[in-house]
Amino acid sequence: MNYPAIPREFFNGDCFDAYRILGAHPCTAPDGAEGWRFAVWAPGATAVEVCGGFDGWEAGVPMERAETGVWSAFIPGLAEGDLYKYRVHGADGSVVMRSDPYAFSTELRPGTASRLAKLDFAFDDHAWMERRDKCRNRPLNIYELHAGSWKHKPGSTQPDGSDGWYNYEELAKELIPWLLDHHFTHVELLPLAEHPFDGSWGYQTTGYFSVTSRYGTPAQFAVFVNACHRMGIGVIMDFVPVHFAANADALAKFDGTHLYEYDSDVGQSEWGTCNFNYYRREVCSFLSSAAGLWMDVYHCDGIRMDAISRALYWQGDPNRGVNQGAVNFLRSLNHGLNKRWPTGIYMAEDSTNFLKVTAPTRYEGVGFDYKWDMGWMHDTLDYFATPFGERPNAYGKLLFSMHYFYNELYLLALSHDEVVHGKKTIIDKLWGTYAEKCAQLRTLYFYMYMHPGKKLNFMGNELGHFREWDEKRELDWDLLKYPFHDAFQKYFARLSLVYATEPALFDGEYNPDCFEWVASESCTEGVYAWLRKGRSQNLLCIMNTQDHAHKKFPLYLKFPCSAELVLDTEAAEWGGAHKGRRKLHFHTTDGGVYGRDYTLTVDLPAMGSFLLRLTPEAPNPDAARISANKAMAQKRRTARDKNSSK
């Protein structure tokens, strides 16, 4: 039988659809026989057979080797759902039963056999695919989700929660209304490529082209994506292009050589997994094709790439130097993704200072659309964990992110990594009593959503979850029976709605002219204030991070205006301290300081925040003179106080 030729691009390292040839595919033989053809790249192998239930996993069907190192076979009479493996006779003398690296489906763990699957899905999401974009000047509010522990079916009793898992189709019906109610624009799924160990959360992958069978079939996952798109929700796939599980039945020493991984000390990661060898072009094509599968076959809207710092530097250590092969691969990957799917969103989890991560490849950048701002995350959580009395010395932590914000296109993330391994959940990290934690949680999220940058939150953050995440258990939905947690998730929904409907919070947010500090020196008071400037509207964000209120706190502006209250974190409906009538409208008065000639005076609640929508008014030509007179009077009072103290 004449087998399809492997495209030249595969061996050049820039193939994005190798899965169309490699792996298992239904076909018709020249004699009219219906069956499946198999193709696997194993250049170091001395022999390969296809084994499966069709022969009792015994002799197997011998495969033919091409000069390219690709082995092929045709087996008639097989059906979708049948299990198979490759028996690989390695260059080192080993004989190992291997899963198909390009399999589209795999049996449920602990089984490791590949499963024959077709990818002929019917989508009706054309309208969504036409209008989706990179959200540069639109809100991007991502809900990070672990499919197996968001919610379980009633009556689940298994310790690992597996009898409570929703399949992909069922999950869509449960999840989409929640996403819509809380105004998320996208859902980002922790890795769904097949993985043997639940506790790896998908980050130790074995089947890069297989949607995990824990939650159903490839067709059911396609239904999930299609359902999200029909309701206006994007789907982002978490992808692990740096390392893979070292299991003997998968990619490690696949043909008796270090085929996919490095063969030196850099071949193993800190997690005991194998690091991909980016200097082998066929490996680059493998990874590019795996990313391409999610974008092309499953209509995903973006890829979040995990642990990119471990690729940019050898072993993730800047002292060991830049891994130029990895940098070249990532540039090629992002360039290829953008060429084929230009409206997709491609994000990097990177904690290093490597330059130009989000610069286009034509400007020698790595080519990502967004980079997680790990510095913002650490500084924010550190500050809110600081005792109130020590916060004046830590005041700069909440200012620092804006010193470097415009160096990259940043996304602010409070992800799964921040609520595991003894780190505590977001609310439990905060300093103070239960009541103080609750008030500060509202203000912390106010800071997040009013700060420039796209947003991502792990599931449960919107509940004020106190228990650390456990992949074996569903979220503590009973929390919604408690007044604070129910009020907080409603506050979170309102905050997300404000973010989604106030253009000043997303339009032009990567332009330095669209942000201005108003109060950034009030370290003793713990007050921060800043302007978010839109094309037609300015918003004033005010935040008190201390445990006491500030009466008549002055904020100095460059223009006169009236102000309307948009959001009050201490409103009674969110469980806050403001039980009576609130002041909803404010006006500036003439006179200010620091060249800001107008003053807006507000009463700031303890640990509370305000969002005000500003409407400019006609300037007073005497305002500058009034400011100067105030400044002179202040100097005189200061001098008089000094003289009287002598």
Regions of interest found by a model, annotated:
Residues 1-141, 168-179, 183, 436-438, ...:
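Carbohydrate-interacting/catalytic domains
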Residues 42-44, 54, 67, 77, ...:
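Short, flexible loop/turn elements at secondary-structure junctions
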Residues 95-96, 151-153, 195-198, 243-246, ...:
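Short catalytic/ligand-binding loop motif for oxyanion handling, primarily in non-cytosolic enzymes
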Residues 109-110, 299-301, 315-472, 500-555, ...:
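Conserved alpha/beta catalytic core and glycan-binding cleft of carbohydrate-active enzymes
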Residues 127-137, 146-322:
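Substrate-binding/active-site clefts of carbohydrate-active enzymes
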Residues 176, 180, 225, 291-295, ...:
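Non-transmembrane alpha-helical segments in soluble domains
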Residues 212-216, 278, 320-322, 430-436, ...:
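Short, contiguous acidic/charged loop-to-helix segments that flank catalytic cores in large enzymes
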